[in-house]
């Protein structure tokens, strides 16, 4: 993972004296999916230390602290909360990262962007020290190779329906002889453009491989998928699952929920078998009928609670609705209220 790419441009051949990294307690605003305030500990962005004339030498890695990977945090029992980025806007990616999400999924399956646009989003996320996951347009070795060369911390393969497809997905992530991934590790962002000499020995331990199950056929094979060596997470896809069952855009249908619960239990059964003997973590999307706190109680380890476009759409619709309602009320009342309530939630609030 290219965690240091953001900092290398300001480092020179001269010696450096590193500054310790400090942390800030951030109180997050109330989420549309969570009822209570949440707090996180987030490292302050590191500023390149000044150049000093000294005989002490340091390496680039000495000037930063390396946060735990998503994979490590899952193994430590954390529940991670993230966002899907469909706009491919680096600005929205950075805002999401600074807001405190544990991860951001850059969605190449349903978003309009390609590799170049995804790279810009990964730069923005790296600047805010937030892990990126890339969801591929399809489970394909060429797409996987190009995405992995960008250096995301995780990769998600859509529409995995059986053990064979899951094994192929894992093979796309590993170099020969363990897989079929093409090698250009000396010049790609994933290895800090060849500067990270430990990339080849570490990347398999750090990369989070996610297989998305989103069909009735996939649910039937979900335990086999979860037990494939190298599959770290099984991501549930309730919308496509409902469509495959004949209930398009109705993931809250009773029959869809029953199948989804069966799938969840199948994945969790493999998780309980322990990391040494295989098994995967359970991840999924929150829905209006299935809120994040309910998913956490059912055993989900990774939860995506929102989509950037959806959040922006809802904010816009609510903003226009509020203004239109004020116009309607003004028809019966000529007095204009210039108080605080009229300016609430505009600009900075």
What are these regions (language model features)?
Residues 2-349:
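Expand to "…catalyze enediolate/carbanion chemistry for C-C bond making/breaking, isomerization
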């Amino acid at each position: 993972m290219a965690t240091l790419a953001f900092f290398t441009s300001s480092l020179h051949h001269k010696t450096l004296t590193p500054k310790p990294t400090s942390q800030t307690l951030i109180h997050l605003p109330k989420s549309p999916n969570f009822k209570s305030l949440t707090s996180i500990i987030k490292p302050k962005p590191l500023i390149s230390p000044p150049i000093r004339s000294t005989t002490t030498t340091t390496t680039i890695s000495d000037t930063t602290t390396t946060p735990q990977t998503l994979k490590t945090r899952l193994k430590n029992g954390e529940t991670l909360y993230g966002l899907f980025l469909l706009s491919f806007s680096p600005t929205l990616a950075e805002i999401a990262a600074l807001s405190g999400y544990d991860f951001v999924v850059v969605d190449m399956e349903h978003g309009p962007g390609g590799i170049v646009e995804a790279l810009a989003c990964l730069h923005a996320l790296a600047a805010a020290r937030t892990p990126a996951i890339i969801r591929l347009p399809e489970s394909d070795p060429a797409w996987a190779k190009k995405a992995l060369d960008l250096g995301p911390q995780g990769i998600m393969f859509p529409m995995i329906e059986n053990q064979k497809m899951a094994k192929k997905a894992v093979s796309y992530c590993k170099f020969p002889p363990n897989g079929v991934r093409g090698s250009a590790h000396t010049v790609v962002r994933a290895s800090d453009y060849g500067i990270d000499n430990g990339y080849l020995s570490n990347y398999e331990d750090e990369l989070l491989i996610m297989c998305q199950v989103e069909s009735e056929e996939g649910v039937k094979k979900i335990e086999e998928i979860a037990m494939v060596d190298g599959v770290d997470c099984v991501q549930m896809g309730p919308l496509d699952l409902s469509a495959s069952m004949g209930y398009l855009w109705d993931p809250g249908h009773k029959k869809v929920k029953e199948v989804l619960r069966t799938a969840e239990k199948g994945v969790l059964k493999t998780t309980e078998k322990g990391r040494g003997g295989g098994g995967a973590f359970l991840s999924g999307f929150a829905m209006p009928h299935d809120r994040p706190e309910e998913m956490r109680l059912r055993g989900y380890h990774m939860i995506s609670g929102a989509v950037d476009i959806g959040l922006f759409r809802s904010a816009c619709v609510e903003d226009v609705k509020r203004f239109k309602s004020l116009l309607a009320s003004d028809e019966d009342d000529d007095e204009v209220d210039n108080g605080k309530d009229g300016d609430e939630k505009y600009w900075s609030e």
